[in-house]
């Protein structure tokens, strides 16, 4: 494709694309996240986990202050800010890796960016809060736009279990429901891209995420990963792709593995994603994924840094 960005820009960070796969290590400072809830609520525990993730090979840290797992409880803006702001401030003072904040609330994003984060990971692709695009643009942050089928699949069995996410107006949701999954994914992300670009966010500041596991049945998550290369939304432009398969339900269902035994399945999903064009992966278990990305990059990207 022509006009594709050569790098991803987020604040003062600039990551070259196409030479390696970047790993975003997940750090949830929540009591109820689906996989690691309650483990890193204290500041000391969060900092120790961040140090471990970076030592294992994380290139970025993704900080979450509100769980979006099925059945999770809503958190006020003030509480979400109180959870993440001190952690981000300490991380920025201790480490040089980019910090991402996982939120769909503009006020939370602004507080996180003011504390030193440089990326907003928005699971609603800027459609959960009408102010989010303006905040991202004004603060020159990078943004991850995630396709989220929960927002338009009212009543779908794979979507109703997510109780903590907004829904789209029917004028937007109904046309998306009429499309096949790949087309709906592209159209959803196109809406997010349009909001970003109209607000003044540069193409170089945007990452796309197909949203595997959000409002999707197992075969649908697999289908999106298989068609990852086709998930784009700007004519003539290939935007970088992030995939977040970590410990997801579709891995457990396919492999018949409980939540705490999905590291190998996650690594396999990461390898398949890289082969299909992923530039970033978001995971809990960094060490096995770092080995996976290093080998995949050596083979698929001919990356000299991946070889000893």
Task: State the predicted function of each range.
Residues 2-3, 10, 18, 35-44, ...:
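Active-site-adjacent loop and "lid" segments of alpha/beta metabolic enzymes
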